[in-house]
Amino acid sequence: TGASLGQQGDAVSEIVREIKKAISIPLFVKLTPEGGRIAQVAKALYAAGADAVGGTANRLGIPPINLDDPGQAIYHLQKEISMSCYSSAWLKPLALRDTYEIRKVNGPGNMITATGGVRNYRDAVEMFMCGADLIGICSEILRSGYEFIGDLIADLKKYMDIHKISDLLTGKLT
């Protein structure tokens, strides 16, 4: 699976090197958090030429089981139970940890994308403090609509003005 391959820095580095040979645009690599070696794999990918690396804002789990037909998946596009990806606010502490570990091991010169559980400007500031250069948001936009983005940016600017912050505090905790 992608999750098991993503734990092998040498294998994923080979893929990154080949992609970099074929493209002329920046390459952002989204890592699997499964396996617990995310910072070390990120290090190998930066060495292979990745322009940015980030943790995946989800975790694998078993979806709810249909108690009336346990072998049938609850998702209509699948015939049987399989792993599903879970994300949203509960994941933020894990996403912060992944971001922090990637920054701590790889230093300030490497771009990090962070995703997982950002629902307001405070969550975004925490991601930046743990080392993010860029933040990805999905679940909250799906829940609240695109206007969420403008609100988040306005609140972030207000926070920065109040605290007289001119940059995004990237890596403040590392």
PLM regions and their residue ranges:
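Glycine-rich phosphate-binding active-site loops on the catalytic face of alpha/beta enzymes
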Residues: A48-P63, G117-V118, D123-D151
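Glycine- and other small-residue-rich loops at beta-strand/loop junctions that grip anionic moieties
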Residues: S4-Q8, K30-E34, S84-L91, T113-G117, ...
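Short beta-strand/loop segments at the ligand-binding rim of alpha/beta enzyme cores
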Residues: K21-T32, K104-T115
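Metal-dependent enolase-superfamily TIM-barrel catalytic cores that perform enediolate-based chemistry
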Residues: T1-A22, L31-T32
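Glycine/Thr-rich beta-alpha phosphate-binding loop at enzyme active sites
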Residues: T1-D10, V41-A42, A48-P108, S144
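C-terminal helical cap(s) of enzyme catalytic domains, especially alpha/beta-barrels
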Residues: P63-M83, F128, S139-I165
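Generic structural signal for well-ordered alpha-helices
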Residues: V12-R17, A39-K43, T99-Y100, A124, ...
